[in-house]
């Protein structure tokens, strides 16, 4: 199953969907896990606080969350977190999936775990940037709900101030009606990627890298991961494969960094607003000043010694 939606200068110009497996329940408004696209929504949420004068990117997290200072995290600022430089790419304790439900987030079940977690940095200062694949969203959520005057979770903010006003299907934490519209994820697996990499590009190869390039990149990633996280646990209890994201309890919880659900139409609509400077038509997601600060002064660094990145 796949969807594609493209806006050009604020106008929707492409709106496609299809089901290669002839799924009768799949359509343009089906919801799909968009994984790390949710990280952009985290950035919008934090930028909204900055735009309202409730936070700055230089604010240390413990200023708004005093208990966070445990384990030597007292100097970590909001910008460090957003740049994947908080030293919390993994946790020592696997999270219970029910702790991700909004009511349990507000009861500080997840927050208390983060408060007691020591940061893990690699030795070289130049390689402090490590991909917080799932954990960044959890920490951002804790910061956001403490600063937001209404005490909302990120999913609640998104529904009330972004997705709702735009009528855009982008959700963090699904309800009963939304669960009925979800299309399961089906991983292709490394074998499919490897087989596809053998096809020459002139014959329509569907993956970017050829076999040898793919193997070189995979080897570097695997060796780096083993060096950094050889003893790390799964981020969530009983999570043994990517299929765990199809679990209903997981879908109901808030993991913004890796478990946001959207239609292509919804995600593209929000992207169009951001491409227009934070406002499109009568709906403003961010003030222009907040939008400018969000994109100011990108900092280059290697992500885990593998991938060159530039984050503001």
Sequence positions of predicted segments:
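Short, well-structured active-site flanking segments
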Residues: 13, 29, 41, 47-66, ...
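Short beta-strand/turn segments that mark the catalytic/cofactor-handling region
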Residues: 310-312
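Penicillin-binding protein/beta-lactamase superfamily catalytic region
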Residues: 176-307
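Secretory-pathway/luminal and periplasmic proteins that interact with or process carbohydrate-rich
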Residues: 13-15, 68-76, 87-93, 165-175, ...
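A short, well-structured edge-of-sheet supersecondary motif
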Residues: 1-25, 57
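Active-site-proximal loop and beta-strand segments within enzyme catalytic domains
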Residues: 21-134, 142
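Short, contiguous, pocket-lining structural segments
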Residues: 128-135, 149-154, 258-262
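Short glycine/serine- and small hydrophobic-enriched flexible loop segments
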Residues: 47-54, 138-146, 269-276
């Amino acid at each position: 199953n796949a969807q594609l939606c493209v806006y050009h200068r604020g106008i929707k110009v492409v709106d496609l969907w299809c089901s290669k497996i002839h799924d009768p329940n799949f359509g343009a408004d089906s919801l799909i896990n968009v994984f790390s696209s949710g990280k952009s929504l985290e950035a919008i949420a934090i930028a909204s606080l900055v735009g309202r004068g409730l936070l700055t990117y230089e604010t240390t997290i413990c200023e708004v969350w005093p208990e966070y200072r445990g384990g030597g995290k007292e100097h970590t600022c909001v910008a460090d977190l957003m740049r994947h430089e908080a030293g919390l790419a993994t946790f020592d304790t696997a999270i219970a999936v029910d702790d991700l439900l909004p009511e349990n987030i507000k009861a500080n079940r997840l927050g208390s775990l983060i408060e007691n977690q020591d940061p893990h940095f690699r030795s070289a200062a130049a390689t402090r940037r490590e991909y917080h694949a799932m954990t960044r969203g959890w920490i951002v959520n804790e910061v956001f709900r403490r600063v937001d005057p209404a005490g909302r979770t990120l999913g609640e903010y998104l529904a009330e101030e972004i997705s709702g006003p735009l009528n855009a299907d982008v959700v963090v934490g699904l309800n009963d009606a939304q669960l009925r519209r979800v299309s399961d994820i089906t991983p292709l697996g490394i074998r499919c990627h490897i087989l596809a990499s053998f096809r020459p590009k002139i014959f329509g190869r569907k993956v970017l890298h050829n076999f040898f390039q793919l193997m070189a990149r995979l080897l570097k990633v695997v060796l780096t991961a083993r060096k950094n996280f050889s003893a790390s646990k799964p981020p969530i209890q009983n999570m043994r494969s990517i299929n765990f994201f199809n679990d209903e309890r997981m879908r109901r919880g808030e993991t913004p960094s890796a478990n946001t659900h959207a239609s292509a139409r919804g995600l593209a609509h929000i992207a169009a607003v951001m491409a227009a400077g934070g406002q499109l038509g009568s709906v403003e997601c961010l003030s222009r000043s907040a939008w400018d600060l969000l994109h100011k002064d990108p900092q280059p660094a290697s992500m885990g010694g593998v991938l060159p990145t530039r984050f503001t």
